[in-house]
């Protein structure tokens, strides 16, 4: 799989789950994002499908009994998203910058960027352990996102006739994130 396709693949997975269960892409993406903290991608998808399936068949109360590999609070958010009428409510429920950005990347918001400790290290230009990554407050988060957006713009301008012509900020983040983890042997 092309690294650049990471979020497009996530979008297709969310669309497939949405179609199978008669919900919107945004709702499926919201559930996936809600269940993502400390959850491997493959398990995240299994958990999202299970919650959505049980919710569709038996409702919120039964969906609360589904086992997931993330925090109980995040399962609560996933169910709230299933009960939520609009995309704006989904973002309010998700609440955090990183998890909301992950949701936006899945649904294809071009300038959304999911900033975690690895993305910070890439931006900072030095490998830091996660315990040495500072708290990424609102202002710093916005600065890092702005720099990823600018990097995408520079690459689009430089590569207007090649494969970078339509590069998004979230693709720059995904490419650098996966490459960084591979170069540094980071598996978790």
Locations of the language-model features?
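HhH-family (HhH-GPD) DNA N-glycosylase catalytic core used in base-excision repair
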Residues: 4-188
């Amino acid at each position: 799989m092309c690294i650049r396709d990471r979020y497009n693949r996530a979008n297709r997975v969310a669309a497939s789950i949405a179609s199978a269960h008669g919900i919107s892409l945004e709702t499926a993406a919201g559930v996936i994002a809600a269940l993502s903290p400390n959850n491997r991608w493959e398990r995240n998808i299994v958990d999202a499908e299970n919650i959505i399936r049980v919710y569709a068949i038996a409702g919120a109360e039964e969906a609360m009994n589904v086992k997931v590999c993330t925090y109980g609070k995040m399962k609560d958010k996933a169910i709230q998203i299933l009960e939520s009428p609009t995309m704006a409510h989904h973002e309010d429920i998700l609440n955090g910058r990183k998890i909301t950005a992950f949701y936006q990347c899945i649904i294809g918001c071009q300038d959304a960027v999911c900033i975690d400790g690895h993305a910070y290290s890439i931006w900072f230009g030095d490998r830091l352990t996660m315990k040495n990554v500072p708290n990424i407050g609102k202002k710093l988060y916005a600065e890092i996102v702005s720099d990823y957006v600018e990097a995408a713009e520079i690459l689009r301008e430089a590569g207007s006739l090649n494969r970078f012509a339509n590069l998004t900020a979230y693709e720059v983040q995904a490419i650098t994130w996966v490459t960084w983890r591979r170069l540094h042997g980071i598996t978790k």
